Amino acid sequence: MQHYRLSRRALLARLMTGAAMIGGSANLPARLRAMTAAGIRLTNGPLVLEFDPAMRSRLSIDGLALTAFEPGEALRLVDGRVIDRFIMVDHRDQPTFGPHGPGRRHTLRATADRVEQRLTVTLFDRYPGLALMALAYRNTGAAPLAIAGWHAAMHDLLSHPKGAWSFAGASYPDRRDWIQPVVAGFQQANYMGMNGSDYGGGTPVAVAWRPDAGIAVGHVDTVPRLVSLPVSTQPTGTRLGLSSDQPTTLSPGATLTLPTTMIMVHRGDHFRPLDSYRRVMAERGLAAPEVPQASYAPIWCAWGYERNFTTAQILATLPKAKSLGLEWAVLDDGWQTSEGDWAVDRTKFPRGDADMKAFADAIRAQGMKPRLWFSPLAADPGTALLRDHPDMLLLDRDGAAQNVSWWDSFMLCPAFPPVVEHYKAQIRRIIGDWGFEGLKLDGQHLNGVAPCYNPAHHHARPEESIERLQDFWKALYDQAVAINPQAVIEICPCGDSFAFHNIPAMNNTPASDPTSSWQVRLKGKTFKALMGPSAPFTGDHVELSDRHDDFASTYGIGAIPSTKFTWPRDNDHPLDKRPPGGYVLTPQKEALWGKWIALYRAQMLSQGDYLGGLYDIGFDKPEGHAIAKDGRLHFAFYADHWDGPIELRGLSRGRYTLTDSFTRQPLGTASAAAPNLNAWFDHYLLVEATPLEGTA
């Protein structure tokens, strides 16, 4: 173990600016003088992480500098000062072994005026390019230290002539793309708390990448934290890191411990760092559950009839849905009288519970599986639930309820045990009594909540509501699968960037109200990283896609098809604006829908191995995706129009015969030595590559 130490007396004599410190290092012990002159250089595969004597750091990948030396860690004080220059006084290096396997732990101790910084950097053999950083600050002065905020792992990815792209895991009311080009003036705070009354939470990772390399930063705590992961353009490149604006006062001798930070250098887009993040979090106890086969079944949803459906309309559509190869029938919003009470609407189901059970049985009688829409944690004003249990509400520091805008309702606190028990009882009713085999848990408010100050809840801290939201969802999931181990639990946080910490409580997720086919694809790629390469991701209703029929964007990324067509006619009085022609399944649509669903069922690419590292979704043109399944490679390319060569990546030895997956037309052959295919297409091209026998 290496260990260098500077005495406190020698340190205080040099407690000046970084330049003065370096200039005065001649009187230090020889080994420490070498350390302060050259700093510390840590390596892990392609990653090189360097710290200079002032604790400024630089990131490199395979010898290529991605950042300059800069103060990646800093404290902001209430009086306006920023502490971002420290004197490194101690470095310890020792082997370590834990849930992430073997590695080396480096502990760096540094000091500035009245503050000691302790940074532990751990590098793991199984995660080349990645480091975990644990950072703490101790007040070494005699007076309290008023802190306004901090940042960690903050770096500027140096600019590239072709620019940069970014992934951000925060949620916003405008339902923006999770992946965006970093253009001039780009700035996004990526606050992981609430960015709207009912939009918040997400995946606490930010990624910025150039065509040749990128940087990812996130935290790996197993509960959500109220931090930001800002991404912005800077004169020299793209800045990203982890930060907080939560003020705190540090008493003399007290320590501020920050969330454990992940930093990674990588090639390609955001897929590899998110895949590494998933594996790290699984080793820390946060992983997706086992997936039942039914999670991959294609879906028909009754939402085309909207809330004012009739049961006769739905039941009459089931034979058509079944004939197309669809296996799930989802009863959407409108079966209930209100959010909160969840009483059955007796204008549609006159016998209440008995009719709900009979309805689920009728779906099964048609050879399909019944799934029910449900929106926990929202309660409408005037409901019996809020009349009898006002203590269930999540309240802010002023005693006001959190608004759920979509349903004009109020948020209940997921950390209050009576709320958990209320919804577990609803699950027992839906899955156990009525016999539905799946749940569609829907609403942007599902993703994140605000801190709760309701005095009736006796929270140790207001943030308990945030940290225990994942426990609420897991309690509902466990209740459902205890009744039916094959139950499909879908969480659809409409338009949000999905909250990673909720993943253990679901075994299916959709594109959650995509605004474009591009969103279907970028969300699909992201989920295949966050849940695994065979994650059961649904493309959401195809009617939401470009041209209202873009099954190709679902099929090509290994997603599950879903549709909300009506038949033989639409509702006479729609509540929302419909696309031209409405949702009715015309004979032309029926032929197209049937062909795509049959292709999905024949190939089942959703259960294949999504090869997210082969193509860069930002820089590669045309946009490319690849899936390995049953010895074949399935490629998907997307562009408004393309005329030129396409590279088929990931081919092994030997030759492959190429076929258009949709038309079944031959496209020639290719090999790893000659992987290019000259192609002309509008919107999409799907290519199936089959190894030729005897050419390996």
Q: What annotation goes with each model-predicted range?
A:
Residues 669-696:
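C-terminal beta-strand-rich structural cap/linker in extracellular carbohydrate-active enzymes
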